[in-house]
From Swiss-Prot:
Completely overlaps RPL13B. It is found in: Membrane. This is Putative uncharacterized protein YMR141W-A. It comes from Saccharomyces cerevisiae (strain ATCC 204508 / S288c) (Baker's yeast). It is a single-pass membrane protein. Keywords: Membrane, Transmembrane, Transmembrane helix. The chain crosses the membrane at residues 54-72. One of its GO terms (cellular component) is membrane.
Amino acid sequence: MHNLHCLAMLIPLNISRHPFSATRLFINWSKCQLSQRMILLILIFATFQRQRDLIIPRFLLLIYSVIQCLFLHS
């Protein structure tokens, strides 16, 4: 549960409103497990996608929600 702190500020909609705040995600990078780092990379990619396309793909939000539920129930 402690490692969920890494994901607490990764809500995609929040990142989409403040793209440059994504840089602070790396502060907790070393505390995250490998599977959580993959989520970080997905969400950072989504951030840059939004800057170019002005939208975050809905399937990324779905993937994030599903994986977050898995972490909460593991």
